[in-house]
Every structure is written in C-alpha cells, then in structure tokens.
Amino acid sequence: MRFPAASVAVDSTPQLRLLQMKDSHETYSTVQLVHSPLPEKGPNSVLVDVPQQISRRKPTAEQSFVSGSDSSRSSTKSSSGSRPVMTTTADPNIVTAASTESVSSSPKWLPKKADTDDRVQRSRERNRIHARKTRQRKKEQMQSLEGRATDLKHEQIRLKQIINEKNTANILVGLFSKGQSQSPNEDPRVEALMYRSVEEIPDPSKIPELPALILPGQHASKKIKVAVPVVAASPQSMSDGGGEEVASTSDVSGDEQQVPDDGIDYDLLGKDRSKCTPEELDQIRRERNRMHAKRTRDRKRIFTEEMAEMCRILEEENHLLRVHLGGLDSDFKSESTTTSTHVVDRIDSVLSTPTLASCAPPQDMVSVSLSPSQLPSKPSTKEVAFNQLQTLLDVAGSFERQQREAERKVPQMCSISAASDTSTSDSSHHHRQRRCHKGDSDRPVKRQRYQVPRSITTTTSLAAPVGW
C-alpha cells in the first residue's frame, strides 16, 4: 500500500523533526525521526519505513520522503518488490529499520519449528512402537511360562502313574521269591510326591494376586463398620476394659492405612475431591494414573517371578521321579531274572506229579538244528512277567481240575459198596441203570442215591427142574 499525496510540514528544530502527514480521512499521524548531520554536498533525502503497528492501523500510509530544504517535496515509488526498502543516499551513518523480506515470503523461524515438530512426532511414534513391542514380548513370555508349567504338571502325573505300575509289577514278582523281598529305601521326597494328590500340584491358577490397595481416607466408613461388631461380640465389651478395646481397634485401623513408600503421593490421592481446585484435581488424576501403571507393572513382575519359581520346582520334582523310575527298572530286571528260576522250579515240582502231568502247559523248545539267525530273540521284561502270570493261571486251573475229578470218584465208590449189600433183585436193577448211564455219554456223571437196607435176608435159588 502507498501513501496518497499529503501535506508535509518539517520542524526547523535542528535536533528533532516532526513529519505531519494528512491523509484522505483528515487524521494526522506523527513519526519521530532521528536527526543526524547531513553532508554539505549532495541531496539530502531519507526513505522512512513506517512501523508495522502504524501500517496495520493506517493501511493507506506507508512511506514518505523528507528533503533538506523546505521547498523540495516529492514522493517516489519503490521498485524493490511488493514491500519498499529504506535506503539512504550520501549518508551511511543513518540507521534504518528496513526489512528485506517480502510479505508473501514466510518467516525464518517457520521451517525450524516445522522441523522440530516433525522430529518430536517421529520420536513419539518410535516410542509407541517400542512400547507396543515390549508389551507383546512380555505377554509372550508369560504365556510361555504358563505353558511350561502346565506341561511339567502333566509330565509329573504321567511319571507317578508309571511308578505305580512298576511297583505293582514288583509286588507280583516278589510273591514267588523264596525269601521276603525287601523294598528299597525310598527317598522321603519321592514318597511325599507319590502320596500327593493331583489338586495339590502347583498350578498357574494358584498364584496369589497383588492385594488391593486402600488409599488413605477411602472406605473409612466400611472399616468402622467392620471394627464395631468385633468389639461388640467380645465378652468383655461391657466390662471395664471396653475402652481399651476400642482404642486397640482404632490403632489397628490406623496401622492398616499405612501405605508403602514407593514414590507415589498417597496424601494427595487421599484428599477430598469436593474441596480441591481444578489444578489439584488434574494433579490427583495424573498421580492416580501413575499409581495404577506402577501397580500393573508390579503385578506382572510378581506373576512372572512366581511362574519362573514354580517351573523350577516342578523340574526338580520331575527329576527326582525320573531317577526313582530308573532305579525301579533296574531292580525289576534283576528280580525278574532271579525269581524266574524259582518260579520254574516250583512249577516243575507241581507238574511232576502223575495227576498233573497231563495238564502241564506246552513249553517252547529250541531245536538244535536251527541256525543262529533262526534262534528266538530274548523276551522283554513285560513278556517275562506275562509268561509268569500265564503259568500261574495254568497251575491254578490244573489244581481245580484235579479237585473236580476227585469229587466225581467219591460217589462212584459209594455206589459200588452199597450195591454189594443189597439183594440180587436190587443189584440187577442197579446194573441196568448203570448200563443205561454208560450208554448215555452226553449226560454228565451224576451222583447216585441209594436206600439204606433195613434188614439183611438170604434167599435160596430155586432148583431147576430136571431136564431144563
């Protein structure tokens, strides 16, 4: 913007000159100029740049020229751009406040501020990425610890089941040994693990959580309600010692309100919100957020430490069970080899009797003509135990069959002795019945019932007629 033509009056004071400009709105503005001695030769003219505040108020006034003589008055236009530049002719000592930048160009501090904001934004984004990765890493660590603890628990249950099966097999093998088998000295820790139930095995769900924190001044009414019934229920509440009990309960409630010294301003958090200023409320909010964040970190840290300790304990217990199981395997092999000979000897002695010779189980014999490649392989421990049990069942079955045959022979002997004492008519009748029974091979042998004779009579056979 340019000044329109205006009347100019210059003061004749040598130290100070006042330029009065009258614009189109008949308003005056004064500009104070600093006077400096001018050279004797050459034109004396100064281009004055109106300050920014004056240009904002008076957008029509921008620049003026001051001449050394009263008669020379002129105005020139600047050709340096959209904004004029204040220049001095013939006097380098005059200080000017001209600006070399145009209005359309941006200030110098704008690029620096933009770079600073961009750098801060990148830093915040980088921090968010690191925080997210840290949370994800801790979450995966906790999940891995939980899975490890669960696997160790299942492994311990499986080891205990295998040990119980081995103990049962050792008991069955020890029944046929000549002497009483002495059980090996077990580790008391292993014995305690074997008698421990599945519910008592450590589990991630049994880890205690961080206790709730009661801030000072909060839930005070609940504490009083809980403390009063305790005093009323005591038998000495109505006696002289009631006052002492009330004092003790108040002391306990005061002790319960003790908070840890962890850098959190709990006194500020315990203030009454209705009596706080907005600044204090904002400070309380920030402090509360800090407290919750810190307790969350502490809770995760405690859970991780407890899980690591639980995994370590389960690994030690499983190692003890594996060592004990290895000892049982070696003992079972040695006992099976020593007792197998005794079992075979007892079975041979039982089967050597004539009544059980026919009931002896077949034995697999190795032919001499077999080549070494055709020899049977060495049976495993389970096969040996199974063969021993099968042999025992066969022996028990042979004893049962022998007893049945003995019971069948007793009625036959009784029937023969009774038939000799009866009359001839009865004996013939019995002989016919016996023949009928012998002819019927499908029916099982049954015990015959005979009547006891009441008297013994003798009969003479009738003489045959002559010529019969």
From Swiss-Prot:
Biased composition (Low complexity): 64-82, 95-106, 417-426
Leucine-zipper 1, as annotated region: 145-159
Keyword Transcription: yes
Domain bZIP span(s) in chain numbering: 117-165, 279-333
Composition-biased stretches (Basic residues): 129-138
CDD domains assigned: bZIP_AUREO-like (cd14809)
Gene Ontology terms: cellular component: nucleus
UniProt xrefs under Gene3D superfamilies: 1.20.5.170
Region (Disordered): 55-149, 234-272, 400-468
Pfam family, one: bZIP_1
GO molecular function, one term: DNA binding
Top-level taxon of the source organism: Eukaryota
Swiss-Prot/TrEMBL induction comment: By nitrogen deficiency.
GO biological process: cellular response to nitrogen starvation; positive regulation of gene expression
Record family assignment: Belongs to the bZIP family.
Protein name (record): bZIP transcription factor 14
Naturally occurring in which organism (per UniProt): Phaeodactylum tricornutum (strain CCAP 1055/1)
This protein's encoding gene: bZIP14
